[in-house]
Amino acid sequence: MEKNNSFIKTIGGKIFAVLAIAAAIFCLAALYVITGVNAGVNNDKNIILDDGWSVIYNGESYNDVNLNNFRLTKTMGKGDKVVLYTSIPKNFKYDTPVIKIPTTSSVLKVSVNGKLVYTYGEDRYAENKLVGSGWHYIPVKKTDAGKNIRIIITSTEAATFSSIDAPVLMEYSDVFQQMMIKNRVRYVSAVSLIIFGALIMALAGIMMIKTKGMSRLFWIGALSVTVGTWTACNYRLMQLFNIPLPVTTTLEYINLVLGALSAAMYFKDNVYELKDTLMINLYKIFVGCLSVFIVVSFTLQFTNLYHLPSLLEVIHVFIVLEVIYMMVLMITSY
């Protein structure tokens, strides 16, 4: 027993030292990013293309549309298509102009004056593969000013979106800086969660070899990693490293589901300490159903029979049920 206590104290000291160093690095990184010199980047230079659109959807035409206020009559389903028309502004002065267009699990086609200049996802959709979600940067020429632009968005999954984010005309050289400035807190948080979680999981794994009761620490680490990875994917940090959209989207949904499992496993000891038969049985049913869902959904995802984005509503149901259960558990415990 004395040997085990000595081991725990030694490892505990190492954990504290590692986390203290990591926390210091995090604070310095956060301070650097938040207060960094960004004088050369000006978001005001961007031209938001939100007004004056013509939209064709579900056989209906809408003119002089402001995309900020526009909502589709129903949520886009698999195979649904929306077409948007407008003119490229004449007053931009960019050296390397691009139009930033966000999409959610959709095929994208962009034409300028009837000439196709950009396409994404058509081949993957034809093969029933995951297309993915993210930002697209469509290059345009200075001579394209004033020309007509047509955007065709085709949904590849069930229940993808019901509103359309306004495209943005901007300078390509500002893309990276603007992404970092706008999302710097999220990015630092995501990276920190992943690093902290990985360290905790590794240390907990080592400690579990010598002593019991370290599983909660392991699941804290797992939850930290999944939340950090989901954040990085959801806010498009992965695109900074040119990771393909299908990979980013797959990681986003996998970590969303595994995060729910990690949280459930963390509370396992609390559930059994109550010695409440009903709560224990409900916990077993929930974890069992979630585990089956993970196996089935991941199998469907990687065999391209059915993709995780189409199961988002089911995932949300699991998360809501888990939150309700955890609230009841905490109330019952205290």
Role assignments for model-derived ranges:
Residues 79-87, 96-98, 135-137, 148-150:
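Intrinsic-disorder/low-complexity, polar/charged segments enriched in Ser/Thr/Lys/Arg/Asp/Glu/Gln
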Residues 45-60, 106-116, 167-168:
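Extended low-complexity, serine/threonine- and proline-enriched intrinsically disordered segments
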Residues 191-334:
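Juxtamembrane segments at transmembrane-helix boundaries
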Residues 165-211:
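Cytosolic-side membrane-insertion boundary helix
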Residues 5-93:
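Extended carbohydrate-recognition surfaces in non-catalytic/accessory domains of CAZymes
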Residues 108-148, 154-166:
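Beta-strand-rich ligand-recognition modules
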Residues 93-112, 151:
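Aromatic-lined ligand-binding clefts that engage carbohydrates, nucleic acids, or primary amines
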Residues 37-38, 161, 232-237:
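Membrane-helix interface motif
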